[in-house]
Amino acid sequence: MALHITLLDGKLHDRSGFSCGIAALDDYLHQRAGQHQRDGIATTHVLTDNTQPARILGFCALSAAQLHLSELQQADLKRLPAYPVPAMRMGRLAVSAAEQGKGYGQLLLGHVVNLALSVRQTMGVRVLIVDAKDAQAATFYERYGFRTTTSKALSLYLPISAA
């Protein structure tokens, strides 16, 4: 089995067969992801394997964003202009209930960080923002270096460095 992460393709990927156990995330993939992608609101990246390329193992949704300076931790304010910093937002991250515990969330997150680093080469991206659904999700992101914003405990960001 070889894993692949690609953009959602409504003609190829079976969105209706996906269930992560969280209705809001399932509904987004089933009902809004395709439209958001067509309208330029967000892109949805899906994890599949070559043995069943239509079956979605996990997904994440990305969009452009900004983060106000007042939401950054003090240590992250160095050498920044006096206006919001450019960001990439990962609005959703979900793994199929049948596939949880296999490291697919970590794989998708790594994909997003690599995309942010790549985008940074062509336009400004200072941080990757996530809005965790609950404290357990926030803990997942904190394990990978995300920091809570000063305004909300479930809103986190990861500084994207050029290194």
Which ranges hold each PLM region?
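Short glycine/proline-centered loop/turn elements that form peptide/ligand docking sites
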Residues: L109, D134-A137, A153-I160
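Extended hydrophobic secondary-structure segments that form protein cores and membrane-embedded regions
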Residues: H45-D49, C60, M90, V127-A132
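Conserved beta-hairpin
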Residues: G40-A64, E71
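Short amphipathic alpha-helix that is part of the acyltransferase structural core
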Residues: M1-Q35, D39, R55
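Conserved acyl-donor/pantetheine-binding loop and adjacent beta-alpha core of acyl/acetyltransferases
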Residues: F59-R92
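Conserved acetyl-CoA-binding loop-helix of GNAT-fold acetyltransferases
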Residues: G101-L115, R143
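A short, internal acetyl-CoA/4′-phosphopantetheine-binding micro-motif in the GNAT/acyltransferase core
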Residues: G91-G101
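Conserved active-site alpha-helix within GNAT-family acetyltransferase domains
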Residues: L117, M123, D131-S151
